């Protein structure tokens, strides 16, 4: 049995402390760690995967081409919750096991969602008079690990908290002191602020559309720290043109970022890169959890 080779392939690197933690786990198990950071072009990834037995990734794309090149590969671990960047069918065809690390980044994402909320209600920090979150109705769209952390923080802000989750029993939501609603439509028509936490799936892609967001009350604020694919961008642009009271804040730059930025100055903001999970703590948690999946 050859020594197991573990490749950490991160175009957007982990914090150094996280890499040190991963290295410690991998080397303690007697495996070899290979680090490929900020590789920029796919050719470098294709070269690096050739002799890897396991790969730890972040938002890196693992498609059929990568899997074809990775002849010795057994395991792919996504450090994070969403694994829409991995071609699962191709992985199955190559007998490669795909794992994720749910829950490790949740608090980091939830805190950022509140940073975006405060920024929006305080008029992008431009010094003019804004509004407060206290007493406002917050809708949490999908009550998973991140959604639960958002609810916890919202209690401290004194918000009235609602949630909709098609897969989470009402009792689970309500025992947290959160009001469970029966549909996405009800959530959007009830809440002043909606925080999106749905994964990108065939069912959810483009589901956040004109008809749904238009149900929001006057001054509605949509915060997206989930995935850009869930937003129907053309319809959201049309709606925000018609309704100048709506705001959209996200940490995933839309494909139509330039259009949003040009048309909706003062009520739209996007971070340059997906950054909800970009904290040293979340990096360490997710990176070490990923390493533990392998060893």
What do these predicted regions represent?
Residues 156-174:
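NAD(P)-binding Rossmann-fold cofactor-contacting core
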Residues 10-11, 57-59, 80, 196-198, ...:
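Glycine-rich, N-terminal phosphate-binding loop of Rossmann-like dinucleotide-binding domains
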Residues 3, 73, 134-137, 210, ...:
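Phosphate-coordination loops involved in phosphoryl transfer and adenosine-cofactor binding
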Residues 50, 64-67, 168-262:
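Rossmann-like adenosine-cofactor binding region
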Residues 5, 10, 17-20, 28, ...:
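C-terminal helix-to-coil terminal segments
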Residues 120-156:
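Glycine-rich NAD(P)-binding loop of Rossmann-like domains
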Residues 34, 53-130, 232, 256:
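Phosphate/diphosphate ligand-binding glycine-rich loop within oxidoreductases
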Residues 2-52, 160:
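N-terminal glycine-/charge-rich "phosphate-binding" loop or analogous flexible N-terminal tail
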């Amino acid at each position: 049995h050859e020594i197991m080779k573990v490749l950490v392939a991160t175009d957007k690197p982990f914090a150094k402390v996280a890499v040190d933690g991963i290295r410690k786990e991998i080397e303690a198990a007697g495996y070899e760690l290979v680090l490929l950071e900020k590789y920029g072009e796919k050719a470098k990834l294709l070269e690096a995967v050739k002799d890897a037995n396991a790969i730890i990734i972040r938002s890196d794309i693992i498609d059929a081409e990568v899997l074809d090149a990775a002849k010795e590969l057994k395991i792919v671990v996504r450090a994070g919750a969403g694994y829409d960047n991995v071609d699962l069918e191709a992985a199955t065809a190559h007998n490669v096991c795909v794992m994720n690390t749910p829950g490790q980044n949740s608090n980091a994402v939830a805190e950022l969602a509140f940073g975006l909320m405060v920024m929006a209600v305080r008029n992008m920090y431009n010094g003019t008079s804004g509004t407060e979150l206290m007493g406002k109705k917050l809708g949490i769209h999908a009550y998973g690990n991140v959604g639960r952390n958002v609810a916890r923080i919202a209690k401290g802000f004194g918000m009235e908290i609602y949630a909709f989750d098609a897969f989470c029993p009402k009792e689970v939501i309500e025992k947290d002191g959160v009001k469970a609603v029966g549909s996405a439509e009800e959530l959007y028509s009830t809440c002043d602020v909606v925080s999106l936490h749905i994964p990108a799936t065939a069912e959810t892609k483009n589901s956040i559309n004109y008809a749904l967001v238009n149900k929001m009350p006057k001054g509605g604020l949509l915060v997206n720290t989930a995935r850009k694919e869930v937003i129907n961008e053309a319809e959201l642009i049309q709606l925000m043109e018609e309704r100048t009271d709506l705001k959209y804040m996200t940490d995933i730059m839309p494909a139509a970022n330039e259009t949003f930025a040009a048309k909706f100055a003062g009520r739209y903001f996007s971070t340059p890169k997906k950054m909800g999970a970009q904290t040293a703590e979340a990096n360490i948690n997710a990176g070490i959890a990923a390493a533990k999946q392998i060893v």
